[in-house]
């Protein structure tokens, strides 16, 4: 039976600069990941039966489920300063179906000089979670999403704020932003 939707909200304190060397801080980078194939999870746990694993270790969160139909509808990435969205990114949908195998979606958010993040469950929404890291990114931010089947990488997306490219699985640039040129 196919399961519903889960949303991850990644929020991280950051510092960006324009090409004219005037530093413009943005205090939140929120990444919302809409995934089809997982439902009814707690903040963080490991199931010995491998029905569902939600691990968080070293800035990485992984979702593992057996016999799954898993993919993502979209990834919305917002750069926020003083509660105002100053830039937006979107990675389009990807649905990869592999029944009878272990499917894993691994997301990774990297930043220099940040503290250890934590997972938070939103009140009133059992399917929405966040990872928050406090600190400032002086050397850029990188966000990765990987879709893996039986240890075979099926698809990988990378967002860098700094050089600021979004790559598809073939390494081609979908979008280029020169605004945050470190």
From Swiss-Prot:
One of its GO terms (cellular component) is host cell endoplasmic reticulum. InterPro entries: Poxvirus_TNF-rcpt-II_C, Vaccinia_virus_B7/C8. Its main location: host cell. Keywords: Host endoplasmic reticulum, Signal. The keyword Signal applies. The keyword Signal applies. Coiled coil: none annotated. It is found in: Host endoplasmic reticulum. It holds the Pfam family CrmD_SECRET. Residues 1-16 form the signal peptide. Belongs to the orthopoxvirus OPG192 family. This is Protein OPG192. It comes from Vaccinia virus (strain Western Reserve).
């Amino acid at each position: 039976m196919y399961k519903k939707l889960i949303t991850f909200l990644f929020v991280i304190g950051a510092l960006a600069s324009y090409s004219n060397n005037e530093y413009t801080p943005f205090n939140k980078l929120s990444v919302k990941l809409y995934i089809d194939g997982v439902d009814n999870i707690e903040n963080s746990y490991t199931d010995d039966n491998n029905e569902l694993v939600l691990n968080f270790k070293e800035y990485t969160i992984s979702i593992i489920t057996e016999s799954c139909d898993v993919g993502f509808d979209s990834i919305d990435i917002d750069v926020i300063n003083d509660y105002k969205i100053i830039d937006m990114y979107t990675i389009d949908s990807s649905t990869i179906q592999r029944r009878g195998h272990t499917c894993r979606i691994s997301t990774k958010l990297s930043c220099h000089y940040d503290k250890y993040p934590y997972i938070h469950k939103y009140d009133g929404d059992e399917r929405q979670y966040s990872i928050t890291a406090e600190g400032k990114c002086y050397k850029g931010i990188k966000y990765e999403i990987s879709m893996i089947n039986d240890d075979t990488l099926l698809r990988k997306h990378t967002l860098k704020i700094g050089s600021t490219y979004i790559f598809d699985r073939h390494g081609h640039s979908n979008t280029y932003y020169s605004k945050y040129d470190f």
